[in-house]
């Protein structure tokens, strides 16, 4: 059930971004329109009373699963159309509303179908399967689309990029024209050189930026891709930075009293190399050949920074299409990566992928239609006239805010993860930033190993263990240990910021410890939301709790990056530790039944 809950979310948030990028949609349009897909999950508490008042949660679950499957099939059918972007965005938006409604019903069904101690025992399993869905969506679906794409179109062309520590810096020459003779053989992609060697000596950032700008202008003038950003568009930093005279005075105060003693100046960038691509002969008139460059294997510290998608036709087939590869400035050893240039049928690949997704959801619909139980408590709570419905609708909201000690409960929801909400935004930048800037200077590949492998495994383990121990001794017994453990992350990263260890296994262990603590401690938070939602309208009230949960994560994360830039990593992690205090103060005011969450057999022994 929770695997099915996670798939639509990852489709809307991640998979759609990759799909549109592969189809040549500009970054500006992707960022703007896919951001709107998040809206239904933000505002879902507004219609949660409808799910609680009308029909059963079981019916809502199977109906929305069927609807999601139909909408995913609709996406697959509209991808080949000329205006696919407009059609698919509209359908995905409807899918997002259906998925948010499915979330409301699934959470309510979980609380109605399980005893209190079972809810505690399975809360870790629930979150684990949700995360498995996230991993499957971001991995398996994208791999499937890539395999189909690679099996169609022109034969793929592989490029090998190698970092060479002993290679001297070489000036990058950009060809203006190519002397290409049309081949009588089959249409193929030609890449020169087939093996690109890049020295590991960092170059001037200004020089690298200048070359990248020239490459983009060349590709634009030769018609290989459209401009993605207007010259007057503001950077994300300009848009996100707080403004105003009082804010500037606050910045000056923080920088003067809490900022790092000396701001590191980072004026070096990873070295780059250029590969030229063209076709072996002109394609048929009117045919466009979209060549997509992507990593096939190798070290993630070598990346493609320009020329991801190049469109050839009979007018530019023999002009130089330029692809730029860059190595991580922290990379000092010989590594290699293989990139593959493919020209498969991108739309066909993603159509098939979405048909597979649709089949998965139709299968889930059939499975849950026959397998899901019929809890006696799962019954509609409203009937009669529209006037009575409106009365019930507003009564649901009123009942939530009329609960005993609701102010303390809401404060706990907002403050429990105040420290973690700030920390999670800066973990990856801290791991990646140069040591001169206060970070750990890891390569992209190593961050993926530390955070994406060891961290995820520890997170799942913490969630499973947290659910188990609460089912044995109850939420009240484990609340304070979980509060302490979830806030270990601040101490972990404070240690890393001051010591800046060179040992990669030590860094991996520290990241795993922080993620384990987060998974273990978050179990208490989820159980407390279930406790607050107890009562007549638990489905709608749980949805309201998740709304406050989202707010508690969103607001602190908005200013955390701004604050870190002012005071540096060391003082930022000290600040994170200080922000654990409000949550602890509110936690001391909570009134929790000692038996809540405890398995009945365990409670009977006492």
Question: Over which residues does each language-model region extend?
Answer:
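Intracellular loop-helix junctions on the cytosolic face of multi-pass helical membrane proteins
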Residues: 79, 83, 87, 115-128, ...
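Loop-to-transmembrane helix entry
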Residues: 25-39, 348-349, 435-458, 505-506, ...
